Amino acid sequence: MNDNWLKQTVDKPLYDNLLWGRPENKLQAGKVLVIGGNINSFAKTVNSYQLLISAGIGQVTILLPRPIFKVIGQISTDLIFCPSTDSGSFNSQSLDNFIDYTSSADGIFLSGELSNNSETLVVIEKLISRVTKPIILSDDSIDLALHLDDNLLNRNNMIYVGNLDKFQKLFSKLKSTDAITSNISLSDLVRVMQTFSQKNLVSLVTIHNDYVIVASRGQVSTTLIDKPENRDIFKLVHHCVCWIIQNPETKFQALSCSAITYQTI
């Protein structure tokens, strides 16, 4: 029996008190800064705005490389266009924007679609090194982060939401000897994620088969996915962002709640 493996369903959540106590006032529902996109890929980052609002966040600001303005225009005052490289991704001068907007946000969502070039990596590295607020990474922002030093990659304000392929790379980077394969059993995955989260500071969220699995500081929760269409990690990550922004001191409970609300809202 594993006392640190907690199980829930949509009908029987682990943390009713948190689910019923969500802020109803937008002013109390948190502010998130979204950073992502490049001139060749930015739709997911722009679409994050509505998904985060639907998940329950109070305010969203999205930072994009400046050339994207020529494509979409100023469709919202919450879209901010930052200095870019010639190839249309964030450059080193973007750091001032990153830091300025982080100061008024409760956390950062690195949404992905970040060009895998050295200048973008350096500016993201400098941002992460200066920020103690929650940072949620998904999609190819995880791949970019794998180039960081271990002391930046492995911090207690870092939350990774991704598939098992990305987690295997993360485990390898942080010198875990456990292997993750696509056909791993649920019980083995729980064991591996529990061990990893005991030894490391980060929190993890993934979907495997019919379950959302959350791991943080040695605790693991599994949430049964009640419908096939809810195997949607893109929707899930936005609920993770919302819950972490609103409950930064109780990451495990917050992320476990996100596994409920992304299926019901």
Predicted regions and their residues:
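N-terminal low-complexity/intrinsically disordered extensions
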Residues: 3-11, 186-190, 250-264
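Glycine-rich phosphate/dinucleotide-binding loop and adjoining beta-alpha-beta core of small-molecule
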Residues: 5-6, 63-223
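Positively charged, low-complexity intrinsically disordered leader regions
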Residues: 1-26
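Conserved post-catalytic alpha-helical subdomain immediately downstream of the catalytic base
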Residues: 229, 233-265
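Short glycine/serine/threonine-rich phosphate/pyrophosphate-binding segments
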Residues: 40-54, 117-120, 144-145, 233-237
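Glycine-rich phosphate/diphosphate-binding loops and the adjacent beta-loop-alpha structural elements
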Residues: 34, 111-114, 176, 180, ...
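Substrate-binding N-lobe of the ribokinase-like
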Residues: 18-82, 260
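Short glycine/threonine-rich catalytic loop with a Thr-x-Gly-x-Asp
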Residues: 21-24, 41, 219-244
